[in-house]
Amino acid sequence: MPESPDAYVNRTYDQTVAVRRSLKRRNSPAASEDGLGWPRRLNLRILAQPCRTSSPLGEDFDYAKEFLSLDLDELARDIDEVLTTSQDWWPADFGHYGPLVLRMAWHFAGTYRIGDGRGGAGAGMLRFAPLNSFPDNRNLDKARRLLWPVKKKYGRKISWSDLMIFAGNRALESMGCRTFGFAGGREDAWEADETYWGPESTWLADERHSGVRDLDQPLAASEMGLIYVDPQGPATLPDPLASARDIRETFRRMGMNDEETVALIAGGHTFGKSHGPTDPSRCLGPEPEGAPLEALGLGWVNSFGTGNGADTVTSGLDGIWTATPTKWDMSFLTTLFAYEWDVALSPAGMWQWVPRNGAGAGTVPDPYDPSRTHAPTMLTTDLALQEDPRYRVIALRFLENPDEFADTFARAWFKLTHIDMGPIQRYLGPLVPTERMIWQDPVPHVDHELADADDVAALKREILGSGLSVSQLVTTAWASASTFRNSDKRGGANGARIRLEPQRSWAVNEPEKLAIVLDRLERIRRRFNDSHRGGKQISAADLIMLGGCAAVEHAAAEAGHPIEVPCRLGRTDAPQEWTDIEWFSALEPTADAFRNYVGEGNRPPPEHLLVDRASQLTLTAPQMTVLLGGLRVLGANHGGSPLGVFTASPGALSNDFFVNLLDVNIEWTPRADTADWTAAYEGRDRRTGEVTWIASRVDLSFASDPVLRAISEVYASADAEEKFVRDFVSAWDKVMNLDLFDRT
C-alpha cells in the first residue's frame, strides 16, 4: 500500500526523493489516473474545456482590451524598482534581482516543446503543480512573490503570464542587454492543465530514454523535474561531450538550432550565480506543494545558516560565472575560453568545473561581502560549448563578434518567450517587433475583396460538379484544418500549407490522392480569380474549406436532413519560402483516429492518441464523438479502410455508426491476423455468425468506455438523426475555423 501523503509533510524535498515518492504516472495525456488498476481507461478530463465561469474575472472579461490600456513604461519603472530594491526576507545577490527574475522567465517559457506544442509561458502554469515544485525551479516561488506588489497594483490589466515574461525582459534590459521586443496576450489559466511531463514516478529519474539516449516523444527535458538537462552531465556524469548531445536534442525539441542554443546558454550564464554552499538534502524543506499550510505556498525553507542571502541553497551547484554577474558583456565567453578547466565537487558534492592550478582566483566578486573574491566556476553544460566541435565554432565566432552575439541572443530570447503564442496576429502591445520570423508561421495579409454569398453558392455547385467525391473533399478539408494545436496555436487551414512541403507529402495525407484533389480545386480557383481580376478573389485555403463544407451539406441532404454549413472566408495562401520544412515537420500526425490512421512507432494506444488530438482541437467529449461518427460514414478513413464504416450508405451523413456499433445483436472479436495497436475486430451476427462489420480499437472504444458509450447512446437513439447532423456541423465548423483568430 502506498504511504499516506501526510507522511511527507515534515520531510525535506531530497529525503522525499530518497524514499521514491510516488508521482502520478501516465504513459500519455489521455491515460487514466484513477489508480484503480484500469490502465486502458481513457482520461477524458483533458477534454473538459476551461470554463470561463471558473475565472474570478467573469465570463465577459476582455483581457486584450485591459492589456492594451496598460502603460508599459510605468510598468517597466515599477519592475525596475523591484529588481534593484533588496528585501530582507530574500536578499538580492549583488543587490540585483535581475538574474533571479531572468531565471524565472527562462524556466517558465523553457518548458515549451515542439513535439506537441505544450509547455511554455502561455497560461501561467508556473504558478501550479507540478511546475511550481519542479526541483529545477527551486526558489522561483520567491521571484513571483517579489513581483506580487506589481501584480497587485495593475490587477487584471496584466496576467501573471505576461508579467513574468515582461519582467524577464526588464531584467535583461536593466542589466544592459538590448531585447528584441515583447508581445502581450497570454491569458492566465486558473488551474493546472493535464500536460504529460514524463513516465517517471520520482523526481530527477530518467525512464524516458531508450536505446542510445533516444528520448521519448513528445518530451524535451532529459529527466523528470528538469527544464532542460542535468547541469552536471547525463546521469550526473561530468562529460561535456555527452552533455552536448543531450543539450542539442533537448534544445532541438524546444525549437532551437545550434546558434540559438549557444547564444541562450552563453547569454543566460552571463548573469547571476548558482547556489550550493551545502547539501540541499540536509537543509531544504518540502517544495511548495508539500509545504505546510502556514507557508502560504512558499517552499524549500532553508535551515542552513540564515536561510537566505549568502546561505541560499538551490541546486547544490555553487559558483559565479563571470566578474560582472549583473552586466551584459562578453565575460562568459571570455572566461570560458581563457582557462583550462578541471572538474571539482561543489560544497554540496556536485560536479562542476574550476580553472586549472588555481587560475582565476580573485577575479569574481562575492554577492554579499565586498572584501571577498572568488575564482569563476563553470558547469558541465557550459564546458559543452567549448568541447563540442559545432558549438565551439559558434561560440568562438560570437566571442570575436559581440554585436552578432548580442543580436542572436536577443532574437533567441524573443523566440523562447514567444514561441508558444502562435501567429503574430495574436500579439498585443506597442513593443511587438515589425519583423516577421519564419517560426511564427507567417501568412500574407488579405489584399483583395472576398467572395460574396452568391459567389460562394456558385463555387459550391462547381466543386460538387467537379467529379470530386464527398470523401475526397471532406478528407482534404479535414487534413488541412485538423493540424491545429491549441497548445501553441500552430497549424490549421490558414496558409493552405497542405499544398506545400512537408504537409503534402505526409503519409497520413495520402500524397497521390491529395494531389488529385488539390489540382482540381486549383483549376476552379484560377477560373474564379481570372474572371474577377482586380476584384474578388478566393484563396486556396478558403476553397479547400469551402469544398469540405459543400460536401458535408451534400451528405446531410443525402441523409434527409438538409442544412447550411457555414464557411467563414478570409484565409490566405503562404508561399513555400515562408514555410520551414523542419519546423513544420513537428506537426505531422503519427496517428489520426478521426481518419482511422495509426503510423509506426506510437507507444500509447490509438484511442488515447484520439483523446489527445481532440484536446488539441479544443473538442469536448460529445464533439469528438459526433465528429468521429460522422467522418466514418462520410468515408474519411485513411486508405479507404472499411474499419468503422458501419453504414450501407457511405457518403450520407447519418447516425449509422452509432446505431450499428451499439447493436446488441452484434458480437465483437479480435482478428488474429492483426497487431495490437492496429488490431481489427470483427462484428458477427449473433444468430448467423456472419461478419457484418469490422472495426478498429478506436471505433470500439465508443461502446467500451462508459463515458463515450453514454454519449454514443444519445446519437444512436431513434430521435437523434437531426440532432446528430446539427451537432456534427457545429463541431465541424469549430475545427475548420480554429486558426482564424479574432485579434488583429
UniProtKB/Swiss-Prot annotation:
CDD domains: catalase_peroxidase_2. There is a cross-link at residues 106-228 (Tryptophyl-tyrosyl-methioninium (Trp-Tyr) (with M-254)). It catalyses: H2O2 + AH2 = A + 2 H2O; 2 H2O2 = O2 + 2 H2O. GO terms for molecular function: catalase activity; heme binding; metal ion binding. GO terms for cellular component: cytosol. Formation of the three residue Trp-Tyr-Met cross-link is important for the catalase, but not the peroxidase activity of the enzyme. Heme b binds at residue 269. It holds the Pfam family peroxidase. InterPro entries: Catalase_peroxidase, Haem_peroxidase, Haem_peroxidase_sf, Peroxidases_AS, Peroxidases_heam-ligand_BS. Transmembrane segments: none annotated. GO terms for biological process: cellular response to hydrogen peroxide; hydrogen peroxide catabolic process. It comes from the Bacteria. The keyword Heme applies. PROSITE patterns: PEROXIDASE_1 (PS00435), PEROXIDASE_2 (PS00436), PEROXIDASE_4 (PS50873). It is an enzyme of class 1 (oxidoreductase). The record marks 103 as: Transition state stabilizer. There is a cross-link at residues 228-254 (Tryptophyl-tyrosyl-methioninium (Tyr-Met) (with W-106)). Keywords: Heme, Hydrogen peroxide, Iron, Metal-binding, Oxidoreductase, Peroxidase. Its EC number is 1.11.1.21. Binds 1 heme b (iron(II)-protoporphyrin IX) group per dimer. The keyword Heme applies. PANTHER family: CATALASE-PEROXIDASE, HYDROPEROXIDASE I, BIFUNCTIONAL CATALASE-PEROXIDASE. Homodimer or homotetramer. Belongs to the peroxidase family. Peroxidase/catalase subfamily. This is Catalase-peroxidase 3. The lineage of its organism: Bacteria, Bacillati, Actinomycetota, Actinomycetes, Mycobacteriales.
